Each structure stands twice: as C-alpha cells, then as structure tokens.
Amino acid sequence: MQQWIEPYAGFELTSTLLSVEASYQAEKLTALGIDPDYYRGWVDPAFFIGISIQAGIDSGISAEGNVNMLTRLKVLRAPKLDEPMRVKGKIESVTEVPRGLRISTNVTFETTTGETLISVPRESLKPMAKASDSPTAGRGAGSRPPPVIQSTSDLEIREDRELRPEQTLGYSREGNAIHYDEAVAQQAGFRAPIIGGGQGVHYLTRAFWKLGGQSDWEIYFRRPIFWDDHIQVGCLANHEGLALCRGEKVLTEVAVRS
C-alpha cells in the first residue's frame, strides 16, 4: 500500500526527465474531441497542469480528493512533442484554512541544458475528511482573487462543448478518483464526477493559444465542471479574459497576462 507523505513547506519534488509523446497527446486530445493535428508538433500547454500534479504524486504527495483552485501557466518557450524535459518542483507553503489545507506548489519544466520552458505555480485545497477534522473553524479555502469576468454577457462565445463521461474517462489517469469514479465523487459532495482542471483548459488553449507562442495565463477554477455538462468557451473583446461558462455561471476563467 502506498505510504503518502503529508505535504509541508520546503518539500522538493523528485526531479525526473520526461517528454510528451506524440502518441500520448493524440490519444488524450482525441478523447476530448480535439483534433491533435491542429498543434503541428507543439505540445498543448494544458497538459502541463496534469503533469505538474502527477510530479507531486510520483514524489509521494497524494492528490486524492484535492481541488485545484488556481494555476499559473507560463510558457517561456513552447516545447515540441517528444522533446526531453526535466521537471523540478517545490511546495512553497502549506496554510491551514477552514476547509483543510491550502497548498502552494511551483513546478518548472526545463531543457536538458537548464533552459526554463514552462513554469506552473499552483494553489490547491486538500480538504479534511470531515468538518471536525478541520484545524480552523468556519468554511472557506482562504482568500479569493476578484473575478476576471464580471458577467458572462461580456463574453464573445467561440464554441459550445457538450461534455460526455466517456471523454473524461478517456482523458483521466488514476490519482484523483473524483474525476472518474461516481461513488467517490458523490461521497465528496458532487452530483457526478468533475473534470480535472487541465481537461477544461484544453478547450481554452485550442481556442486561444497562439501555436508555439509565449503566454502567461492565470487560471482560476471557480466552480466544478461535471463530466456531462454543456459548456461554452468565450473571451472578452480585448482577449485579456477567457472563460468556460455554463449559462450565467463562470466555471473556469483566465487572466491573460501576455
């Protein structure tokens, strides 16, 4: 049985070499209904959200039940498919909040010569098993940045996406069963499994990322997206804000810094 390490500030992730293989990207994007040929040999940056979480799992930090709240996806130099990269990372802080532990992690991906390609700082919530386990009273996961999108009526809708459970099952990997196990998701308080944050961001990178370009996105996961939701992909007229929405509700939003 896996012996997990309780997260603590200063914990360094195991440094490993990896690459995003063309066959892997094709398999996962096809599962989501995205044509992998669109990327023309570039890695879809949305993959680095899941890969950075997996780096923690591989280092002994459980992701089971954790909720991704904020991810910054900064592409300094876009990697190509099958390009070798070294992953490094560190837990910067662990803070007690009413709902559990708020964990700040920074993961970077470098070339074999040390050039930083992508950095992925992340804020996640590790919920307590039950309310009485929480180290602080009340509810909440700590401070929340102000919204990027004031109203979904401000968005220019680019496309509609009808999500299907088989898409999430085909995309997800083991590590956090709330994404693929109905019983676990319901036990966590969700009516159905919720998609991982990275899955939703694939719809945004497909619509708005300039192939091979630098970018700096601050991604806020505001509300859960269920694996059978109907969502819309949109942006502000100035392209400084992107979003996945459902009706009048913003589900995931992005502050585009560059």
Task: List each language-model region with its residue ranges.
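Hot-dog-fold acyl-thioester-processing enzymes
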Residues: 1-70, 136-142, 146-212
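A conserved acidic, glycine/proline-rich C-terminal tail/linker
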Residues: 204-233
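Small beta-barrel nucleic-acid-binding modules, principally OB-folds
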Residues: 63-78, 213-222
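HotDog/MaoC-like acyl-thioester-processing domains
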Residues: 2-7, 70-160, 224-227, 232-258
